[in-house]
Amino acid sequence: MKRRSIKDLEAEIKGLKRKQHNKAMDSIAKEFQRKLYENMTPAELKFKHIAELKGIKLECQYRINIKYKKEIKRFYIVDFCDTINKIIFEVDGDYHNTLEQQKKDYYRTKDLQHLGYKVYRITNEQVYKGLSTALLYKVYH
């Protein structure tokens, strides 16, 4: 079975009824999640390892749907999520330094906070310098 691209799937969902729309969005999200999980960055893998050593259970590449009137309008896939405590950790690479990406990150963070999540951001460089241990300690103690 040939895999469809995310763009192909997005084109298919236009004009669908809510149930069909949500099913199509779910399909897109799962594919995107899978790709992100398979291609985690070295900094993300290091952060995950440190959290595991500290006994902190985090879901990797976790999807959060943004709904309006029960219809999925968009979704975010966050790097790490403590689903019990509603805590999100984002490991930011260099592309997060661009003004355009910073604006996207700002609105994404606001959406997630509106849903009750606490969002913590840490750069790749900070992970490599060992600051993820300090961040996890600060959040969980």
PLM segments and residue spans:
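Nucleic-acid endo/exonuclease domains
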Residues: 1-141
